[in-house]
Every structure is written in structure tokens, then in C-alpha cells.
């Protein structure tokens, strides 16, 4: 079984976006710790299966980050289930999780399921709109959500999601300081090796997503920047 505590870097791929097979191969063989498949727009069973089947040709762990119940398909190494702690809508905190367990609980291995305590901070990102996240929050609120994730809910992952914008690095450092057992994932604005290395000093795992589609070669360099620290 894969241990996220040992990870430092993941690529997040959107099944609704096109990526040439040659680039996908380079990502999968880059040394990244996992390929996470997920997104906010038009995530369907068909496009999830299509991308998973391509990633499955390689040895890298393949993870589905579940955003819709309809996109849950067998064949992934792990299933990340986001619980958006700062969502105004209960469905995104526990409601959809209940529905997923109701429909698929008997079919899924619980060892393959990893719950992420999400805190979405960028007010302009699609994930914030989709989940109705309260992004008008202070530093103290983010730290409180981190403590909720670890100490009250005992979640293995706390995911600080800036999705397209770069966080204040002091925010990441402060968040890491209040976590002991929960693994800190950071995503948002990581577009080159220098930024990845800088944020990788504080976050346990750096997530690189948009950069794959915007500047592939720079995105690829983030692996070595984080993994050799």
C-alpha cells in the first residue's frame, strides 16, 4: 500500500484537458510520487477512464481525486476524498461522502480511501465556486481548519488549495507548524523549479497542476527541485 507520508511531489492532471501521450509519458517517468487525476469541470466516467488507462501503462501510483460520484471507477491505486472544510455547503464536507459510501461502500477497499481536509483560499478559482467555499478567511481561520483536520477529524491530509495563485509562503510555513501527523499538501501557482523548491521547504507535498498545461518543461523541472531537497 502506498504511504502519502513518504511523498514530496505529485502531478495533478485534469481529465477534461488534452495532454499529448509523449508528455504524459515524461510525467509518469519523471520521478514524481503520484499522478492524481481530478478537476472541477466536466469530470465524467469516460474521460476519467481514458486518462487512467494511459497512466496505468507506467509504474507511478495513479490516484483519483473524487469530485463527482459518477466519476468513481475501479482501477486506481488510491482514492482521495476531499472534505472542503471551509465550504458553506454540507454536501462538500460530508454529504457526498455519505452518498458515495451508500452506493459504493461495499465495493471499495477502505485501505484505498484517503480523506483530504481541504481549505480552498483562492476566491476566483473554479473549485471555490463549485464547493461554495468561504474564501474570505484570515490566517487564524486557516490554522484553525488545519487543527480541525488533524486533531478533531484525524485526517491523514490537510490540503491548502490556492488553485492558480501563489500563497504567501509564510502562510504555508505557519500551517505546517501546527500540523504533526497530517500531511500538508500545497497546491497553487507552482510553475517552475525555484518556486517548487521554495514551497517544498515548508509543505510536505507540492502539487503541480496548471503548469503542466501552461509550460510543460518548467513543470517537469519541479520534480527534481522538490525531490532532491
From Swiss-Prot:
Bilayer-spanning residue ranges: none
A Pfam short name: PcrB
Reactions it catalyzes: sn-glycerol 1-phosphate + all-trans-heptaprenyl diphosphate = 3-heptaprenyl-sn-glycero-1-phosphate + diphosphate
Cofactor(s) recorded in Swiss-Prot or TrEMBL: Mg(2+)
Molecular function terms from GO: heptaprenylglyceryl phosphate synthase activity; magnesium ion binding
Residue sites binding sn-glycerol 1-phosphate per the record: 12, 159-164, 189, 209-210
Top class in the EC scheme: transferase
Pathway it works in: Membrane lipid metabolism; glycerophospholipid metabolism
Binding of Mg(2+), residues: 14, 40
GO biological process, any: glycerophospholipid biosynthetic process
Domain of life: Bacteria
Annotated signal peptide: none
InterPro entries in the record: GGGP/HepGP_synthase_I, GGGP/HepGP_synthase_sf, GGGP_HepGP_synthase
Keyword annotations of the record: Lipid biosynthesis, Lipid metabolism, Magnesium, Metal-binding, Phospholipid biosynthesis, Phospholipid metabolism, Transferase
EC number(s) per entry: 2.5.1.n9
SUPFAM superfamilies per record: FMN-linked oxidoreductases
Family statement: Belongs to the GGGP/HepGP synthase family. Group I subfamily.
Record note on quaternary structure: Homodimer.
Function: Prenyltransferase that catalyzes in vivo the transfer of the heptaprenyl moiety of heptaprenyl pyrophosphate (HepPP; 35 carbon atoms) to the C3 hydroxyl of sn-glycerol-1-phosphate (G1P), producing heptaprenylglyceryl phosphate (HepGP). This reaction is an ether-bond-formation step in the biosynthesis of archaea-type G1P-based membrane lipids found in Bacillales.
Name this protein carries in UniProt: Heptaprenylglyceryl phosphate synthase
Organism: Bacillus velezensis (strain DSM 23117 / BGSC 10A6 / LMG 26770 / FZB42)
Gene assigned in the entry: pcrB
Amino acid at each position: 500500500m502506498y504511504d502519502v507520508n513518504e511523498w514530496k511531489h505529485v502531478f495533478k492532471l485534469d481529465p477534461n484537458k488534452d495532454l499529448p501521450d509523449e508528455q504524459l509519458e515524461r510525467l509518469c517517468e519523471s520521478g514524481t510520487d503520484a499522478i492524481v487525476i481530478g478537476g472541477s469541470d466536466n469530470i465524467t466516467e469516460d474521460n476519467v477512464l481514458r486518462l487512467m488507462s494511459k497512466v496505468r501503462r507506467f509504474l507511478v501510483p495513479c490516484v483519483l481525486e473524487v469530485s463527482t460520484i459518477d466519476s468513481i471507477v475501479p482501477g486506481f491505486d488510491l482514492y482521495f476524498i476531499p472534505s472542503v472544510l471551509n465550504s458553506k455547503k454540507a454536501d462538500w464536507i460530508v454529504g457526498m461522502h455519505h452518498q458515495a459510501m451508500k452506493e459504493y461502500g461495499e465495493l471499495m477497499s477502505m485501505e484505498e480511501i484517503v480523506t483530504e481536509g481541504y481549505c480552498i483560499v483562492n476566491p476566483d478559482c473554479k473549485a471555490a465556486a463549485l464547493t461554495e467555499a468561504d474564501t474570505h478567511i484570515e490566517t487564524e481561520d486557516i490554522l484553525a481548519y488545519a487543527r480541525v483536520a488533524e486533531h478533531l477529524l484525524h485526517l491523514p491530509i490537510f490540503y491548502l488549495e490556492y488553485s492558480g495563485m501563489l500563497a504567501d509562503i509564510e502562510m504555508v510555513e505557519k500551517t505546517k507548524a501546527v500540523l504533526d501527523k497530517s500531511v500538508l499538501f500545497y497546491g497553487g501557482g507552482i510553475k517552475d523549479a525555484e518556486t517548487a523548491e521554495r514551497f517544498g521547504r515548508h509543505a510536505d507535498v507540492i502539487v503541480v497542476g496548471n503548469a503542466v498545461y501552461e509550460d510543460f518543461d518548467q513543470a517537469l523541472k519541479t520534480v527534481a527541485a522538490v525531490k532532491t531537497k
